[in-house]
Amino acid sequence: MEIILLERVAKLGQMGEVVKVKDGFARNFLLRRGKALRATAENRAKYDGMKAELEANNIKAKGEAATVAEKINGRDIVVIRQASETGQLFGSVTVRDIVAALAADGIIVSRPQVWLDAPIKTIGQQKLTVAVHPEVEAEITVTVARSVDEAERIQRGEDISTRREDRDAAAEAIAAAGEFFDPDAQHDDEPAAEDDQNAEEK
């Protein structure tokens, strides 16, 4: 389907451009959200009549979006989730979760504005783009952790990837070292010393 864009659409075109897209994308997203018109002769004339107003509205919206982007840009959003010892989440963090976390921080955006290629399924950090306006973007960081303490460690750049096996091995090494230096521990040379003493008494 050929459409006339009423605003800039990422990876598609600028306001006023006539582009060809799949029918489903046009009907379910672009036309429904008022981002485009069908490229008919009637709508071409309609666009020419509303072009000046659209451009004025876009300039105003772009300025407001720039103010919002300044507040969002560089934010680190923390999402707490349960995960395995290896950092694999029991579930995932989706765009819906990120939008909710932003809202809790006083930032209201819609799901289509958050660009996430695939749900987040591991503990750690990921940078995302938030399209505040078709021509204004901001970058945020999403920190996924099992606790607030762990999130702070991740934000400081600490390595939290140590596996349980590694921690167990370290604990065993510490325990072995403690036993080695225990003054009450039985040592192999004690029986020999006792035998020498018995020999002297005889």
Swiss-Prot record:
Tell me one GO biological process term: translation
Q: What's a GO cellular component annotated to this UniProt protein?
A: ribonucleoprotein complex
Q: Which SUPFAM superfamilies match?
A: L9 N-domain-like, Ribosomal protein L9 C-domain
Mind telling me which InterPro entries this protein's record contains? Ribosomal_bL9, Ribosomal_bL9/RNase_H1_N, Ribosomal_bL9_bac/chp, Ribosomal_bL9_C, Ribosomal_bL9_C_sf, Ribosomal_bL9_N, Ribosomal_bL9_N_sf
Gene3D superfamilies tied to this protein: Ribosomal protein L9, C-terminal domain (3.10.430.100), Ribosomal protein L9, N-terminal domain (3.40.5.10)
- Molecular function terms from GO: rRNA binding; structural constituent of ribosome
Q: Where is the composition biased (Acidic residues)?
A: 191-202
| Residue numbers spanned by region Disordered | 176-202
- Whether Magnesium counts among this entry's keywords is no
What does this protein's UniProt record list under function?
A: Binds to the 23S rRNA.
State the protein's name: Large ribosomal subunit protein bL9
Gene that this sequence comes from: rplI
